[in-house]
């Protein structure tokens, strides 16, 4: 039953949150039935004061409580169930990780099938799934792969731990072997900027290993590859109908963040060429200028701050992208939990970091990506990644 429970959970990581919750609940019920035990919910001791402070902050700024209470119930359910699951599996984390890597491969195979069908028929068969976003085209016959997830960016982040394991640690457990190239190909076709940044980092990593003693040679080769990548990937990264290229999106986002010190939203988002950088800048603006910047406005209140600062003040009623999740965990934590919450989250990442455990490092990569692009607290394995990160902080694992 433990193997079945693990497969249920790693499958849920790549599906929408309500399906993930159902699969997680099923896995926990299987384990409770098999072992006839329930662990004390110790994480609840941390959640209770957080929720009390959060609701108090919401009350002080005069916001409505409907969405905050909904978010509290959802996050609490995920945390309590994942705590039970990881307690049952605390001695079998490597087995669970192996299943996650293999499931990443299966999800990538679905992505390959999605791309092949689109190339042959022009139909994106995945767009009929619930919660799926619009199809993004790279050319008339090539689209951004999403597989079972809503966007290519979501898929790129969800398989990031697999990329780190396969191409930084080089698959020491021999989980995929040569099949790892399928994962890399699909990752590249998601056109997620994080995937391309990872490729540059991986290249630096391996180049340093081979030419570590020859710093000048290493520097010249790195510079040449970066320049080549910018020149060659830019036309490929440009979306056929909807987006500018990968490097344009990265550069435009940097420019938007650099203007964040301005107190006027119109100045912050002016000259933005890409929708993603405009959305990033807008939500970061909300995070910096919402009420109660020390403790935030409370969980689930970012849409209310967004409505007050963007819709009402600047009459920008057409800017509704990512209004619920804030585009990035950084924005949402800053908006809803203030600077104190943001500092506590960074402290959490530092406290549980374990460079001697490859699984810990792999999931840190995913959490860093979510910090910059992915503000939903429970979507696509967010809670799963945080629990894996915590439970692998106590021991070393390198093969």
Protein language model features and the residues they cover:
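Transmembrane signal-anchor hairpin modules in multi-pass inner-membrane enzymes, especially those
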Residues: 1-60, 172-174, 211, 217-220, ...
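Loop-to-helix entry and N-terminal half of a specific, functionally important transmembrane alpha helix
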Residues: 4-8, 52, 222, 320, ...
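Helix-loop-helix junctions and helix-breaking kinks within/between transmembrane helices
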Residues: 13-27, 63-71, 150-157, 178-215, ...
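Transmembrane alpha-helices of multi-pass inner-membrane enzymes
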Residues: 26-31, 164, 203-204, 215, ...
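Aromatic-anchored transmembrane helix interface
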Residues: 47-51, 63-87, 95, 99
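Alpha-helical transmembrane segments of multi-pass inner-membrane proteins
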Residues: 98-128, 140-141, 147-209
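Hydrophobic transmembrane alpha-helices and their immediate junctions
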Residues: 173-176, 203-216, 314-316, 322, ...
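Long extracytoplasmic/lumenal interhelical loops at the membrane interface
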Residues: 264-337
């Amino acid at each position: 039953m433990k193997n079945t429970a693990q497969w249920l959970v790693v499958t849920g990581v790549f599906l929408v949150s309500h399906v993930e919750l159902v699969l997680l609940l099923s896995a926990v019920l299987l384990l409770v039935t098999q072992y006839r035990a329930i662990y004390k919910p110790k994480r609840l001791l941390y959640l209770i004061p957080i929720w009390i402070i959060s609701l108090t902050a919401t009350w002080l700024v005069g916001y409505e409580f409907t969405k905050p209470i909904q978010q509290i119930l959802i996050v609490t359910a995920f945390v309590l169930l994942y705590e039970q699951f990881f307690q049952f599996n605390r001695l079998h984390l490597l087995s669970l990780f192996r299943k996650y890597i293999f499931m990443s491969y299966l999800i990538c195979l679905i992505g390959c099938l999605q791309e092949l069908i689109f190339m042959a028929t022009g139909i994106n068969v995945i767009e009929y799934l619930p919660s799926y976003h619009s199809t993004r085209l790279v050319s008339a016959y090539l689209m951004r792969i999403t597989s079972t997830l809503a966007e290519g960016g979501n898929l790129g982040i969800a398989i990031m731990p697999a990329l780190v394991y396969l191409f930084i640690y080089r698959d020491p457990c021999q989980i995929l072997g040569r099949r790892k190239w399928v994962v890399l190909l699909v990752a590249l076709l998601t056109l997620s900027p994080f995937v391309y940044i990872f490729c540059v980092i991986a290249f630096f990593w391996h180049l340093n290993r081979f030419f570590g003693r020859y710093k000048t040679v290493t520097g010249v080769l790195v510079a040449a590859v970066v320049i080549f990548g910018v020149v060659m990937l830019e036309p490929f990264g440009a979306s056929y109908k909807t987006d500018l290229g990968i490097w344009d999106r990265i550069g435009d986002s940097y420019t938007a963040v650099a203007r964040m010190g301005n107190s006027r939203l119109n100045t912050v988002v002016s000259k933005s060429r890409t929708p993603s950088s405009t959305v990033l800048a807008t939500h970061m603006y909300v995070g910096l200028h919402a009420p109660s910047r020390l403790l935030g406005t409370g969980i689930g209140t970012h849409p209310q701050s967004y409505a007050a600062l963007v819709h009402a003040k600047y009459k920008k009623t057409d800017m509704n992208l990512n209004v619920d999740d804030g585009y990035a965990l950084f924005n949402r934590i800053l908006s809803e939990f203030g600077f104190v919450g943001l500092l506590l989250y960074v402290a959490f990442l530092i406290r549980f970091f374990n460079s001697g455990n490859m699984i810990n490092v792999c999931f840190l990569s995913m959490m860093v990506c979510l910090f910059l692009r992915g503000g939903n607290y429970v979507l696509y394995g967010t809670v799963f990644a945080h629990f894996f990160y915590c439970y692998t902080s106590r021991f070393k694992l390198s093969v």
